Amino acid sequence: MAPSQKRKAIDDDFILTISDNEEDIPLEEEQEVVPRKKAKTATQQSNKQKKKNNKKSKKQQQTEDDDDEAETKEDDAADLGIWGDNDEDDGAMDTEFQFVVDGQNEVDAEFDGWGFEGAHKGVVKGANAGGDKKAVDIDEIIRRRRERKAAKEGKTTATKEEEDKMEVDEEEDDIEEIDVDLDDDEDGVLADDAFGMGVGSDVEEEEEKQDAKMGGVDGEDEDSEGEDGEKKGEDEDEGDASDDDSVATAVEHPDDVQSSDDEEGIDEEEEAKMKEFFAPEEENQPKKKGEMSSFQEMSLSRPILRGLTSVGFTKPTPIQAKTIPISLMGKDVVGGAVTGSGKTAAFVVPILERLLYRPKKVPTTRVVILTPTRELAIQCHAVAVKLASHTDIKFCLAVGGLSLKVQEAELRLRPDVVIATPGRFIDHMRNSASFAVDTIEILVLDEADRMLEDGFADELNEILTTLPKSRQTMLFSATMTSSVDRLIRAGLNKPVRIMADSQKKTAGTLVQEFVRLRPGRESKREGYLLHICKTIYTERVIIFFRQKKIAHKMRIIFGLFGLSCAELHGSMNQAQRIQSVEDFRDGKVNFLLATDLASRGLDIKGVDTVINYEAPQTPEIYVHRVGRTARAGRSGTAITLAAEPDRKVVKAAVKAGKSQGAKISSRIIDPADADKWQAEIDELEDEIEEIMQEEKEEKQLQNMEMQVKKGENMIKYEDEISSRPKRTWFETQEDKKKAKAAGRAELNGVRDKLKSKNEGKLSNKDRKKLDTMQERKQERTYKKGSAERAGKGAVLNLKKVVKKVGRSAGPKKKGGNAGKGGKGKGRRK
């Protein structure tokens, strides 16, 4: 019949396309998904062929093959998984993507922290162009000096050995040949004993003594920490008198009083300004958006979720949960949260989500992120690149110290996001022809409280007046200011205020310790610091200083005492600064000696301890300094050497910590130990000066070589250099100096400003003005002591004396007058 013939034809065609060996089936046929109906049809055909016994042997053999294939397909059809046939990935969804990450620790273990890869391109190109200078290696200078010293001592040793040999030769002539050989060997051994082995044994004995003392000191420190509950009250009672007596003394930083007053309460006028300036509270708390427990609930795109998973972010922090939904709406944001809480991701994630839906036909720069320091910008660039690793979003890093040509080439490609410092951004904005800012849609100010200070006022004003006014602006900081007058500078439009934590709050896992330096012992800071670094905290430590010269001096001292360290401050070029951070991050050095350049935003994994060589100028800087440890839920310790000039900041930090339930304790260090280390440092004072002088000479030599190279290039490439357009700036050198002085005055207070006017000295007139101003600011200028409270004080005795004199003076006066004339009342009677 016709139908049967057609069916046979189909079978014949089907048979001819199948090979005898199933392993040789082409890949395209293997990837095809076979529907269930087709599998059932093949089964019915094979069953019909089984019932026919009059088929040829060849046909029967083929039917058995069809049987096996049909059974396999039937089983596959019954066991079809989520991917289709054979339960394998058909390419519809990436197998590496995970909606719920169970093994969070495994993800975190793979991520080693943020690197500075984004800055290496600019550094390398700058070095090739002759813009980079070699750093003077302090360790190399110390090594050379020790080698010279050892060689000198070796010559003296050789001279003494020759004299000894001559004496032996004269006394023992009979056994000259034998004894000379023996004496040579013995003298060699004795010389080694005298100059090598003896010194080594002395050093070992000293080290053993130090180790024994170390154990004792550690034990005492632990005991003192354990007895804080008992002894702390006594120390505070004893310290109250000294603190109260010193209330009227000169304090270097009177601005701290104003900051504490601002913290205690906001006046009604400022509160009214805030209500008018910020968005209403109802908009700050949308429905359940502040309570999101995972990034999946935020409806983020898959590439963004994959980027978050790659860096180990599985659960949003409070600032992220509150900020991301509001930022996606396009509203202006003023955000604040504790250090190490993920503020960078809080503004990077919504930016990436919005950029995924941008028009891609014409590349355009749409986002600008500004930071106050270069290191923070480099780190922010690393975070953004890592989170956007599964997208096509492009970034450009534009900071000072790196090659201008490399940055101009990247800006010519019109990247989606530019991460920059204010100065370099203005430079490109004015002098790079291919860089346009009229298409900017989002502006972010990281560490905004620092950016809004007087030091950045002119630069920030230049940027804000150039950018489009219809932009979205976001401000973030751990110590976000509440001053509306400052926030107005950023050009915000009804911003949403999001404070995930109270202002100036430290991490809950941070232990804060304070070492009190009694009056007269401020000069022993170096000894205290060396004792701490040698015996208590020996690795993964960041030490903060106020001044670059002190940080550099301690770098030399640490090198002389065999402590591996690196320094980080503004006098270093960018290549040296990056190298220092990377050496500390990779564990090549145990100590990082830094100024406040590294206090903001720097996220280095595994920092165990932060030491403040002296308290910073303000409580806000203290919060940022100690925030370099105890990040992202990890534990950490911050120890501060506090003397009388640091009293204001320390009191503010302790007060804020106690109100938040932070762990605060006082560490007691034996003054004898500090004096011992200080004495050793004082002995090396001449050597320290010589090392600094040798370093200065090497720098001068390098500078001369650079000037010679520059002159050669000026002659060789004169036409090319003269044809370049001159770079312009928006303010003169005088304006730059004024802005710098204003920033320094705001940071260090009025006293330092007056010092700079008088070349480091205060006149008596200025000193009296400052003392009078500080007396007016004090809440109380006098407090009764223990004697007055017990009724035995000088004031009470003075009152008794006055009363006694008043009573006795009256009768004497009357009696005296009467007696002189001899006509008193008694006489008359």
Swiss-Prot record:
Listed GO biological process terms: ribosomal large subunit assembly; rRNA processing
Residues of the Helicase ATP-binding domain: 324-498
Biased composition regions of type Basic residues, renumbered to the chain: 48-59, 800-815
Main localization of the protein described in the UniProt heading: nucleus
Enzyme class: hydrolase
Molecular function GO terms recorded: ATP binding; ATP hydrolysis activity; RNA binding; RNA helicase activity
Entry-linked InterPro entries: DEAD/DEAH_box_helicase_dom (IPR011545), DEAD_box_RNA_helicase (IPR050079), Helicase_ATP-bd (IPR014001), Helicase_C-like (IPR001650), P-loop_NTPase (IPR027417), RNA-helicase_DEAD-box_CS (IPR000629), RNA_helicase_DEAD_Q_motif (IPR014014)
Record field: compositional bias (Acidic residues): 20-32, 63-78, 164-190, 218-228, 235-246, 258-271
Family annotation (CDD domains): DEADc_DDX27, SF2_C_DEAD
Subcellular location(s) of the protein: Nucleus, Nucleolus
Residues that hold ATP according to the record: A337, V338, T339, G340, S341, G342, K343, T344
Protein origin, superkingdom: Eukaryota
Enzyme Commission numbers on file: 3.6.4.13
Disordered, as annotated region: 1-96, 145-295, 728-829
Gene Ontology CC terms: nucleolus; preribosome, large subunit precursor
One family name in Pfam for this protein: Helicase_C
Basic and acidic residues bias: start-end ranges: 150-163, 272-291, 749-791
Keyword set, alphabetical order: ATP-binding, Helicase, Hydrolase, Nucleotide-binding, Nucleus, Ribosome biogenesis, RNA-binding
Motif mapping: Q motif: 293-321
Motif range (DEAD box): 446-449
Domains as described in the record: The Q motif is unique to and characteristic of the DEAD box family of RNA helicases and controls ATP binding and hydrolysis.
Record's subunit section: Associates with pre-ribosomal particles.
Family of this protein: Belongs to the DEAD box helicase family. DDX27/DRS1 subfamily.
Name by which UniProt lists this protein: ATP-dependent RNA helicase drs1
Organism: Neurospora crassa (strain ATCC 24698 / 74-OR23-1A / CBS 708.71 / DSM 1257 / FGSC 987)
GN (gene name): drh-11
